[in-house]
Each structure stands twice: as structure tokens, then as C-alpha cells.
Regions:
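Acidic-residue sensor for enzyme active/binding pockets
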Residues: 14, 40, 55, 109
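Conserved catalytic cores of phosphodiester-cleaving nucleases, focusing on short active-site segments
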Residues: 17, 21, 43-62, 81
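Catalytic cores of nucleic-acid endonucleases
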Residues: 58-114
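Domain-level recognition of nuclease-like catalytic cores that cleave nucleotide substrates
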Residues: 92-147
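Active-site metal-binding core of divalent-cation-utilizing nuclease and nuclease-like domains
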Residues: 28-51
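Residues at secondary-structure transition points
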Residues: 4, 8, 12, 38, ...
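Glycine-rich, flexible loop/turn motifs
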Residues: 30, 69, 132, 136
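Acidic-basic catalytic patches of nuclease active cores, encompassing PD-(D/E)XK
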Residues: 1-33
Length: 147
């Protein structure tokens, strides 16, 4: 089995989150890794009347349980997500999939199991079924404070 570094784990965590959101939650993924200046949004999706901006946090199960991945989304990061989301809406307000939609920010925590259960065969690709997902809908207010 292949070892992965933090960047690769994060990339695969985002892939797992996209898979989860589309297959399990019915979201339509319209973009990923959107940048506005130095601010990034991991996933942009549609969920009914909402355009959803998603922050993905991926951690290994071996880390302390009290350190939930979502806790890594601090106030400054939340403000950056909001600024990037506002920029995306401003740049795309004339598109049908944005016009008239309400917006919200979700956080998806992906907790990865021990190495021996992570991957499909020897492909190095993380399996959705092997991960624990915690989906926090509407995770914080537009001023960055937690709900």
C-alpha cells in the first residue's frame, strides 16, 4: 500500500467529499478549488435553492478524537471563505445556476481510517466507504461566527 503525504491526503479527502455530496446528498457539483486572490473554496455545489460553498477538512483517525477536523476552520479561514464566496457570486451573478439562489457554507469532515483499510486494492485511491464523514450544513453565519 502506498503512503500519502498531507497534500495528497487533502486532495483525496476533497475527492471523497465531492463523491459523498453528489452520491449521498444529491448535490450537483459545479466547481472545485476556486480561488479569489489567495482565498480558496474547496467545492462549489447546488443543493435545491442554495448555492453551497464547501470547506473540506481531512484527518486521519489516529489523531486525537477531540481534534475534530472542522475545528481547523478558524475565524480567519471562515472570513476568507465568505470573501471568496461573495466574489464567486459577484463574478457569476448573471448565470442561471447562480441567479436567485440563496447561499450557505457547509463544512465536510473526512476522517480516514488506518492505512490497511484506506485504499481500493493497491490503486492508492481512498474509498468513500472506508471513511467517516461528518457534514455540517450551514456551518457559520455570513460574519464568520459559528452557528
Amino acid at each position: 500500500m502506498k503512503n500519502v503525504n498531507n497534500r495528497e491526503l487533502g486532495r483525496q479527502g476533497e475527492r471523497i467529499a465531492r463523491e459523498y455530496l453528489s452520491e449521498k446528498c444529491g448535490y450537483t457539483i459545479i466547481g472545485s478549488n476556486y480561488y479569489a486572490s489567495h482565498k480558496e473554496i474547496d467545492i462549489i455545489a447546488l443543493d435545491g435553492e442554495y448555492i453551497v460553498f464547501v470547506e473540506v477538512k481531512c484527518r486521519t483517525k489516529t489523531e486525537r478524537p477531540s481534534h475534530r477536523p472542522g475545528r481547523a476552520v478558524g475565524f480567519a479561514k471562515r472570513k476568507n471563505i465568505i470573501e471568496a464566496a461573495n466574489r464567486f457570486i459577484f463574478e457569476n451573478c448573471d448565470l442561471d445556476f447562480v441567479a436567485g439562489k440563496r447561499s450557505r457554507v457547509d463544512v465536510v469532515e473526512v476522517v480516514v481510517p488506518p492505512m490497511d483499510h484506506r485504499f481500493n486494492d493497491n490503486s492508492g485511491e481512498l474509498k468513500l466507504s472506508a471513511c467517516s464523514i461528518n457534514h455540517i450544513r450551514n456551518a457559520f453565519y455570513s460574519d464568520g461566527t459559528l452557528r
